[in-house]
């Protein structure tokens, strides 16, 4: 399977981004709609992944100007650590281009081991958000600049 990853503005790609996030976050994770679709989407840099054969959206992610990475969603039939790593690589590259000092995200506890392979470190206390135990994880941009991420596919 081949796919394309693009940076997209919310204004042009909102229906495609929303379709993935609705299926993953609202239907599967039972995140309330008003939590999933906040007022930060317009200011974020968004990633959209589409299946090259069907042209359908299959994954999303976003980074805010303050360095917060969030809304990483991959449709169930397309889930693989490889795809999530590629989404993260594009988001981290965007962070470098935004000249951020660090990035952070509020990860589910079960995902922290995976994100540690992307140079993230857990900080602070565990808390509940939308019924999921989470913890803040951070990554200094210097470690991203020195990491070797391949964006080929």
Regions found by a protein language model. Give the residues of each.
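Short amphipathic alpha-helix that is part of the acyltransferase structural core
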Residues: 1-39, 46, 50-58, 141, ...
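Conserved beta-strand in the GNAT
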Residues: 48, 54-73
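Conserved active-site tyrosine of GNAT-family acetyltransferases
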Residues: 21, 114-116, 120
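Conserved catalytic-core motifs of GNAT/GCN5-like acyltransferases
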Residues: 106, 121-138
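Conserved acetyl-CoA-binding loop-helix of GNAT-fold acetyltransferases
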Residues: 80-93
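Conserved GNAT acetyl-CoA-binding A-motif
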Residues: 95-108
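A short, internal acetyl-CoA/4′-phosphopantetheine-binding micro-motif in the GNAT/acyltransferase core
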Residues: 72-80
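Short beta-strand micro-motifs in enzyme catalytic cores
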Residues: 43-47, 70, 133-137
């Amino acid at each position: 399977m081949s796919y394309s990853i693009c940076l997209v503005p919310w204004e042009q790609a909102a229906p495609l981004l929303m379709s993935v996030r609705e299926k993953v976050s609202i239907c599967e994770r039972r995140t309330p709609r008003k939590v999933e679709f906040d007022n930060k989407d317009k200011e974020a840099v968004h990633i959209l992944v589409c299946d090259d054969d069907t042209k359908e959206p299959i994954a999303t992610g976003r980074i805010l100007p303050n360095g917060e990475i969030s809304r990483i969603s991959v449709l169930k039939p397309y889930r693989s650590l490889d795809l999530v790593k590629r989404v993260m690589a594009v988001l981290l590259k965007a962070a470098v281009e935004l000249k951020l000092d660090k990035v952070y995200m509020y990860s589910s506890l079960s995902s922290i081991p995976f994100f540690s392979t992307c140079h993230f470190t857990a900080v602070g206390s565990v808390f509940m958000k939308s019924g999921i135990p989470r913890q803040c994880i951070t990554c200094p941009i210097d470690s991203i600049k020195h990491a070797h991420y391949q964006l080929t596919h």
